[in-house]
């Protein structure tokens, strides 16, 4: 198996010294650099760069700068996704994001883990676990999502949370480690919106 194949199979792989992966990361970093230095008002150029980065035709995806990702092609974005400023997608493992997702500033989605033994860690070994984000979710600022986590549809993750385990659908979850506080009633029609129902 190539190191890339090992990475995608969630096996230990050489993340630091494999030239093919180094080249793929360099490609993504160059596109991120260009995106981060493109005027926010130049929406056509930004759309072109975003599609080039993720190697797909995105549908109403908005990314505020600065933004960073390792590969880009291993992020699968739904429709109507908003990524606020200074977010990082560590996408050695696949990051799947559903439709209508709001991501606050300074959020990180980290699929990589390293050996605890420093001899192996210093040899460049790494393993990547996928992250799955359901549709209609919202992340407050400074949220960290760790490898292997699934966050269910319609959930809200409070600011500053560190998500180490799966979050069920329609949950309000906060903290370090992130824990469910209560369920969210996502069946309320929009006309009932007021100071009580907006909580």
From Swiss-Prot:
- Keyword Cytoplasm present in the record's keywords: the answer is no
User: Per the UniProt record, which EC number(s) apply here?
Assistant: 2.3.1.-
Principal EC category:
transferase
What's a Pfam family in this record?
Hexapep_2
Checking CDD domains in the record gives: LbH_MAT_GAT
Query: Which InterPro entries has this protein been placed in?
Result: Hexapep, LacA-like, Mac_dom, Trimer_LpxA-like_sf
| Residue stretches spanning the membrane | none
Q: What is this protein called?
A: Putative acetyltransferase SAV2555
